[in-house]
Amino acid sequence: MVEVPDRMRPYLRRAYSVADSNPRGGEIELLIKTIGPGTATLEVLPEGSTVRLLGPLGNSFSVGDLGSGSRVAIVAGGIGAAPFPLLLAALRAASVNCDLYLGGRNARELSIRTRFDGLVPGETILSSDDGSLGEKGFVTEALRRRFDAGSRYVRVFACGPMPMFAALARVVGDAGVPAEFSTEADMGCGFGACLGCVIPGTEKAFLVSCSEGPILSPEKIAWDRL
C-alpha cells in the first residue's frame, strides 16, 4: 500500500500489486492507472519524491507445487495485468509453460502488452471488447474457446475486475480447472480491521481481501451476493 506524505487528501493508502522487484537494488515496480485523486497525486509526483510503503500484505499465487513442464494460463483484464510480470518470472524459473490472455476495452487499454515482451514462455492472446486489437469480445470468452478447442491447463491465475471474475469462474468451473483470483478491493487499513475490502463468501459470510486474500479460489466467493 502506498501513502503520499504531507498531504491532507487522500486520507487512505492506495493498494497495488507488485509488478516486479529488484531485491539487490532495493526496488519495486508498480503499474498504476490514474482513476481518482489518489492515483492522480501519484502521477504528478516528481522523480525522487518520497512515499511511504506498507507491505507486502496478504497471500500470493501458488507456484511451488507446479511441476516442470506443467501448463498454466494467466488471465488479465486491463490494469489487472499488474501482478503478472513477477509471476511470469517465477513460472519461468520453475520451467512452467504459460499462456497469457490479456483483455481490455480497446486497443489503448492493451498498450500494457509491451510490458510482457519476452516474458511469456507460451502464447499471448489479446482480446478487446470493441475488436480494435486481437480477438473481439471478452477475454474470458477467448479462454472458453481454447477450452472448447481442447486446450488444457493445470491452473488458471487471474486478476481483473469482479465482473470478469464472475464470468471466469463459470468458464473454469465448466472446464474443471482450479483457479486463483487476485481480487481487487478498496483497502483501508491493510490488516483486516476496517473491513472495507470484504467480499461475500461461501464458507463464511465475508472474506477480508487484505488478510485472507487477495488471492482467493473462485469456489470461496459467493458470486450471487456481489
Predicted regions and their residues:
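Local cysteine-cluster metal-coordination motifs and their immediate loop/turn environment
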Residues: 162-164, 184-215
